[in-house]
């Protein structure tokens, strides 16, 4: 019995240790990431586009995917100067971005509704950027027989303005980039929507020649492997890397080092490809009814990673007609309900770990409660009460078992004094006593065993849900996704654990008793590193457990 109980305690300690390593790494990364956002924001400028060139311009160290019919084994790499005098600025209620007219790439994208730091609300979070510190951009173009992007470079588009703003009262903003081919007029159209992070991309091809225009659309995410957390900390951290859905698996993650070893090529009808980081992501979502070729790989000559799709079926535009090719690009927070509507399985980029089947319903419940009360802290408290109701009867059975254990504690002490030198005889007598008094010595472990998966799932849910990022509670707690700045909640949690121990029977094994006495102190130190939202759950859960256990214990004592 003692062996099983010690194994349980050891398992809890191990899980807690792994969780604290994870959370500590995340905190360190969050600080470093913030510094990067500040640097990026300060280096950004608004500049007007230059006069368009009739000839394609070679991109700066970029790679353009081959058309599906190409015999080339590798994409072509280019080198050229990247000027800052050819950019246009676009602003909506949710996005603040810069498009380079050379290729029509998104080279910077900030999220005005999300702050880099809680106390600096004038400094928006920067998701995409291209500077001396890091490279993370979204590219798209046309490849194939008549494509504008290829071995000879990329097109220089023209725009009607250098600044575009979504005006009050309007729900959409359309930005057209123009390029004149020898026998076609190419319009690259970006459509932005109010209260949305999803960008519609459409290529309009007006064939002014006397032969068919043939080409394929590609979309690509280009990023280096800069990891804001690599300078400090050890252990696990929130996932940073590529993600894709394939016919074989709904969600496949690939770290940078995996892509460096071997590229991934897959064909799929519809699908998506994404670059995932903590709280935020960007993803290309092509036409869900057409076949696409996806390639995820590392550049041959630079420390760059490319996640691309290319339409497998070429678009043919007859002379004197206009054709179009469409795709969508998402860049923003990982809102589960939003991602569910964009494409199948895109919501899996919210990494709830292996207990996702528990964490996901927990978030839906938490989100529903938040819609009623308007405060995430109160929602966590009410969710805790609901969870406690679910475990009410198993907990009651366990507390009755522990109350009976307290009742037979004097008899157990007598057996210990009588057979202390004969452990085998003492164990046999204890089993007889348990059977006679109808006591289950492991009954008190049941609530912990049942709640640990919920506790771990709740941890991941709080850690991965962008809705809790910078979400305030009351008084000194301004962000439930980070640790309590004054450690008030962890101290309260430690006190509740100590009170719970007083209600439980003292273990017969002296060593085990000492370990149990140290548990409140250990967990108090441990929970100082946990997010305040998670500690709040544990405090409320312990308080409700103490109340239930106290009532049951008194009822059994009065019955005697």
Swiss-Prot record:
It is a multi-pass membrane protein. Residues 34-74 are annotated as: Disordered. The keyword Protein transport applies. Pfam families: 60KD_IMP, YidC_periplas. Keywords: Cell inner membrane, Cell membrane, Chaperone, Membrane, Protein transport, Transmembrane, Transmembrane helix, Transport. Required for the insertion and/or proper folding and/or complex formation of integral membrane proteins into the membrane. Involved in integration of membrane proteins that insert both dependently and independently of the Sec translocase complex, as well as at least some lipoproteins. Aids folding of multispanning membrane proteins. InterPro entries: Membr_insert_YidC, Membr_insert_YidC_N, YidC/ALB3/OXA1/COX18, YidC/Oxa/ALB_C, YidC_ALB_C, YidC_periplasmic_sf. The gene is yidC. The chain crosses the membrane at residues 1-21, 303-325, 349-369, 372-392, 442-462, 473-493, 520-540. Its main location: membrane. The keyword Mitochondrion does not apply. It comes from Teredinibacter turnerae (strain ATCC 39867 / T7901). Belongs to the OXA1/ALB3/YidC family. Type 1 subfamily. One of its GO terms (cellular component) is plasma membrane. Interacts with the Sec translocase complex via SecD. Specifically interacts with transmembrane segments of nascent integral membrane proteins during membrane integration. It is found in: Cell inner membrane. This is Membrane protein insertase YidC. One of its GO terms (molecular function) is membrane insertase activity. Residues 34-45 have a biased composition (Polar residues). GO terms for biological process: protein insertion into membrane; protein transport.
């Amino acid at each position: 019995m003692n062996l099983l109980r010690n194994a349980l305690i050891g398992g809890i300690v191990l899980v807690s240790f792994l969780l604290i390593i994870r959370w500590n790494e995340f905190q360190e990364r969050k600080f470093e990431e913030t510094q990067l956002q500040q640097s990026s924001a300060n280096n950004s400028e608004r500049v007007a586009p230059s006069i368009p060139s009739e000839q394609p311009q070679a991109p700066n160290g970029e790679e353009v995917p081959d058309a599906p019919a190409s015999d080339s084994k590798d994409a072509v790499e280019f080198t050229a100067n990247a000027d800052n005098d050819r950019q246009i600025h676009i602003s909506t209620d949710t996005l603040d971005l810069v498009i380079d007219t050379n290729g029509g790439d998104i080279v910077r994208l900030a999220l005005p509704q999300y702050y880099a730091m809680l106390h600096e609300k004038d400094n928006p979070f920067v998701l995409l950027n291209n500077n001396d510190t890091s490279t993370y951009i979204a590219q798209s173009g046309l490849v194939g027989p008549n494509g504008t992007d290829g071995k000879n470079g990329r097109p220089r588009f023209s725009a009607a303005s250098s600044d575009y703003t979504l005006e009050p009262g309007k729900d959409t903003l359309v930005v057209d980039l123009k390029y004149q081919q020898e026998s076609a007029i190419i319009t690259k159209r970006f459509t932005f929507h109010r209260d949305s992070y999803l960008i519609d991309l459409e290529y309009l091809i007006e064939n002014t020649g006397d032969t068919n225009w043939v080409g394929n659309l590609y979309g690509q995410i280009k990023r280096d492997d800069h990891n804001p957390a690599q300078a400090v900390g050890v252990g696990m951290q929130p996932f940073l890397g590529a993600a894709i859905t394939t016919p074989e698996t709904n969600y496949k993650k690939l770290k940078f080092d995996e892509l460096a070893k071997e590229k991934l090529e897959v064909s799929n009808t519809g699908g998506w490809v994404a670059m995932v980081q903590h709280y935020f992501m960007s993803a290309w979502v092509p036409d869900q009814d057409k076949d696409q070729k996806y390639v995820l790989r590392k550049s041959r000559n630079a420390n760059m990673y490319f996640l691309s799709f290319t339409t497998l079926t070429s678009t043919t535009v007859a002379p004197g007609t206009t054709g179009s090719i469409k795709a969508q690009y998402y860049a923003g927070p990982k809102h589960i309900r939003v991602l569910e509507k964009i494409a199948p399985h895109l919501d899996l980029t919210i990494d709830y770990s292996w207990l996702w089947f528990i964490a996901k319903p927990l978030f839906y419940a938490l989100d529903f409660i938040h819609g009623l009360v308007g405060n995430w802290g109160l929602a966590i408290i009410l969710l805790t009460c609901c969870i406690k109701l679910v475990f009410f009867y198993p907990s009651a059975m366990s507390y009755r078992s522990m109350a009976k254990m307290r009742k037979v504690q004097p008899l157990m002490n007598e057996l210990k004094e009588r057979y202390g030198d004969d452990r085998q005889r003492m164990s046999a007598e204890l089993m007889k006593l348990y059977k006679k008094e109808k006591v289950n010595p492991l009954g008190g472990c049941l609530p912990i065993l049942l709640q640990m998966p919920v506790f771990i799932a709740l941890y991941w849910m709080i850690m991965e849900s962008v809705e809790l990022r910078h979400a305030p509670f009351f008084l000194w707690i301004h962000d439930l996704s980070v640790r309590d700045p004054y450690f008030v909640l962890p101290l309260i949690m430690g006190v509740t654990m100590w009170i719970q121990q007083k209600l439980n029977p003292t273990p017969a094994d002296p060593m085990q008793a000492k370990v149990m006495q140290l548990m409140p102190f250990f967990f108090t130190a441990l929970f100082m590193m946990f997010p305040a939202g998670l500690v709040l759950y544990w405090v409320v859960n312990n308080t409700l457990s103490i109340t239930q256990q106290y009532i049951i214990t008194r009822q059994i004592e009065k019955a005697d």
